[in-house]
Swiss-Prot record:
An accessory protein needed during the final step in the assembly of 30S ribosomal subunit, possibly for assembly of the head region. Essential for efficient processing of 16S rRNA. May be needed both before and after RbfA during the maturation of 16S rRNA. It has affinity for free ribosomal 30S subunits but not for 70S ribosomes. The keyword Electron transport does not apply. Its main location: cytoplasm. GO terms for molecular function: ribosome binding. This is Ribosome maturation factor RimM. It comes from Streptococcus suis (strain 05ZYH33). Residues 96-168 form the PRC barrel domain.
Amino acid sequence: MNYFNVGKIVNTQGLQGEMRVLSVTDFAEERFKKGAKLALFDDKDQFAMEVEIASHRKAKNFDIIKFKGMYHINDIEKYKGFSLKIAEENLTDLEDGEFYYHEIIGLDVYENDILIGQIKEILQPGANDVWVVKRKGKKDLLLPYIPPVVLNIDIPNNRVDVELLEGLDDEN
């Protein structure tokens, strides 16, 4: 079964079994809602156990969650540093034109039918995502995910068509 990261437990919060989670999902309200089922993976990325969310709230830069059946700091302290993941079967369908990161990473990038490289990572620096494109013999290309640049995403054919605006590729 495939699992996808939604957050990392970075610390405990108080004495009542709450944990601070650094979220890496665009769907935190859905992923951490009461009753949601997630999987815990240890610091070696080994499956540890399935958990159910008992409560969730936002606080500053963190999501504060509590697991069902774990209501004291002693129950959860051992999970600091663990990752929270969602099973692929529990992913929700997205609207047309929306994609999960795992669908984008690995796609081939083309400009005018010429292969530029392959998407290896997605950064979230601010207003829009930035795709990191690995290229042969050149340094990585940082490609903003904006309509004038990304023209077409074709998941079944493992392809993204782009138009590199002036200044995006400083090696040409």
